């Protein structure tokens, strides 16, 4: 901020009406690989492809469950192997679970169940605020 006061804002910050010298601060991360290394954070801005899946690594395979769905199932006393197996059989989808409300089913839609035009629209909305690269996978 002191340098900006002394020499003025850099051109891209000035265009946005911000008094800064180093304005390139926004990057979209992590990638899918980095998110695994970071302990299961979401893979960036993309919707999840499944609420449960098997993750294969050199060390072996393990099941990954959506922790928010798992918490909801626990609250509803439906967190059972049978329920998770049915979700797995449906490709990670919860749309077949009759004990979930319409809003809950919408909340846990997989990337394949979301209208892809929304992903494009959301990407367009955030693009002016991203200083570095961004990418988007469509499903």
Predicted regions and their residues:
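Catalytic alpha/beta core of large soluble enzyme barrels
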Residues: 5-6, 26-139
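Short glycine-cluster motifs
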Residues: 1-20, 87
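Short loop/turn microsegments at loop-to-beta-strand junctions
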Residues: 22-24
């Amino acid at each position: 901020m002191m340098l900006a006061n002394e020499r003025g804002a850099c051109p891209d910050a000035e265009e946005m009406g911000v008094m800064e010298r180093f304005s390139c601060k926004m990057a979209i991360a992590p990638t899918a690989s980095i998110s695994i290394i970071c302990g299961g954070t979401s893979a960036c801005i993309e919707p999840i492809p499944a609420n449960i899946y098997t993750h294969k690594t050199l060390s072996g395979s393990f099941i990954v469950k959506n922790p928010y769905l798992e918490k909801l199932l626990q609250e509803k006393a439906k967190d059972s192997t049978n329920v998770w197996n049915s979700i797995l059989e449906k490709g990670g989808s919860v749309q077949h679970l009759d004990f979930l409300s319409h809003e809950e089913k919408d909340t846990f839609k997989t990337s394949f169940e979301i209208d892809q035009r929304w992903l494009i629209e959301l990407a367009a909305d955030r693009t002016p605020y991203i200083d570095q690269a961004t990418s988007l996978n469509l499903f």
